[in-house]
């Protein structure tokens, strides 16, 4: 069975909405790949993230904003014959998005982004205190290109 290319934007966005986390990959200052799992929010072809303004992720993004974000969901192990290793496979739905990380500054803009992130996980509004908003790093990725694939569906 071959994997199926997903070309429908609405189907790719449906896959993204089903994911609880994503993996964001970047290239560090030594030219080596660096990938980390993250919580996220998604709205109108923009992916939103938050984290500490200190550390490797922040340093890497400041040096090179090019990123690739991978979403994967609906994993299900399957096999034709459980005694034949090569008949085992994994069903999945996935999306890969490419873009550039852009840091968000200013309390109102940060809060807007944090609300988009939180709306992915909870159907309610939140309040944020000034020190938390001031200290958090918020960045967004405008999707430049998106590719989807499914296998077994």
Give the residues covered by each predicted segment.
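Extreme N-terminal tail/first-helix region
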Residues: 1-18
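Charged, gly/pro-rich active-site loop segments
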Residues: 2-3, 76-153
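N-acyltransferase acceptor-side catalytic subdomain
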Residues: 16-17, 48, 53, 60, ...
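Short, intrinsically disordered, mixed-charge
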Residues: 17, 62-67, 116-123
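Short beta-strand segments
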Residues: 19-53, 69
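Beta-strand-connecting loop/turn residues
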Residues: 45-46, 65, 144-146
